[in-house]
């Protein structure tokens, strides 16, 4: 009777109507039950059930197994979507309250535990999702920062490269100008060297002519000096020797006269002529010897 009473109470719930087995009410009771049981007995049992106290009621009710209740709730959660979880929970709560207060307390605890577990799981999943999102955000931020750093480094490297190229261009231009300047200076030095060499060669030619002129002048002076010396010697010789020659002539003149006087003129003439010729020929020889000694 208690089971039938519980089934009738369950039929009163509209939310739990589709989960209830209607065969209990629809199936007709056998005739033997109707014959054996009278309406008075039924009424008496109902009055006894209503008049008894709570302890007797707890003993009379069939205790539900916690495992069966948890299996039933799990089946409900599996069969129905999450949107109907509230209605299923309400239906389960109603069933437990109808059956027994202790079972209701146990089922309430289990439901609260399940709800807490669900909330914890949901919160854990949300935290995990948040962590994943934060990790993704951190990875994206790191990538962005890395890209920004790479861009900045690339810009700085390009600027340094441009500055280095500009410095090299300036140095190359400066070196080109220096090369041109040094080339011009070298050309000037070469031209100056050639001109100096030409001047030296020209000066050497002038020196040779001057040397030849000087030599000729020296020779001329020497010849003049020699000539003057010879003239002086000649003058001295002429001034000194006429007296001697005159004395010699005076000494030799009386002999031919004497010979002529003695009648020997024919024999004396050749000797006189010879003496005179000898004296005439000796004078230029003496002059020549004096000149050679003076030179």
UniProtKB/Swiss-Prot annotation:
Instruction: Give the region (Disordered) as residue ranges.
Output: 101-154
Annotated region (Leucine-zipper), positions in chain: 168-182
Please list the residue ranges annotated as the bZIP domain: 140-203
Pfam families per UniProt: bZIP_2
Any one GO molecular function term: sequence-specific DNA binding
Induction cue: By tunicamycin, DTT and azetidine-2-carboxylate. Isoform 2 is induced by heat.
List all Acidic residues biased stretches: 128-138
Q: Could you say what a knockout of this gene produces?
A: No visible phenotype, but reduced induction of ER stress-responsive genes. Shows enhanced susceptibility to a bacterial pathogen.
Q: Where is the composition biased (Basic and acidic residues)?
A: 106-127
Q: Which domain of life is it from?
A: Eukaryota
Report the transmembrane regions from the record.
224-244
Q: Which biological process annotations from GO are given for this protein?
A: endoplasmic reticulum unfolded protein response; immune system process
Record keywords: DNA-binding, Endoplasmic reticulum, Immunity, Membrane, Nucleus, Transcription, Transcription regulation, Transmembrane, Transmembrane helix
* Tissue expression pattern: Expressed in seedlings, rosette and cauline leaves, stems, buds, flowers, siliques, immature seeds, anthers and pollen grains.
GO CC terms of this entry? endoplasmic reticulum membrane; nucleus
Spell out the disulfide connections. none
Looking at the record, which segments are called Basic motif? 142-162
Q: What is known of its domains?
A: The C-terminal transmembrane domain is cleaved in response to ER stress and the N-terminal fragment containing the bZIP domain is sufficient for transcription activation.
Could you share any additional remarks the record makes about this protein? Expression and cleavage of bZIP60 in anthers observed in the absence of stress treatment, suggesting that the ER stress response functions in the normal development of active secretory cells.
Q: Which family does it belong to?
A: Belongs to the bZIP family.
What this chain does, per the entry, is described as: Transcription factor involved in the unfolded protein response (UPR). Acts during endoplasmic reticulum stress (ER) by activating unfolded protein response (UPR) target genes via direct binding to the UPR element (UPRE). Plays a role in plant immunity and abiotic stress responses.
Quaternary arrangement and interactors, per the entry?
Answer: Interacts with BZIP28.
Q: What's the protein here called?
A: bZIP transcription factor 60
Species name: Arabidopsis thaliana (Mouse-ear cress)
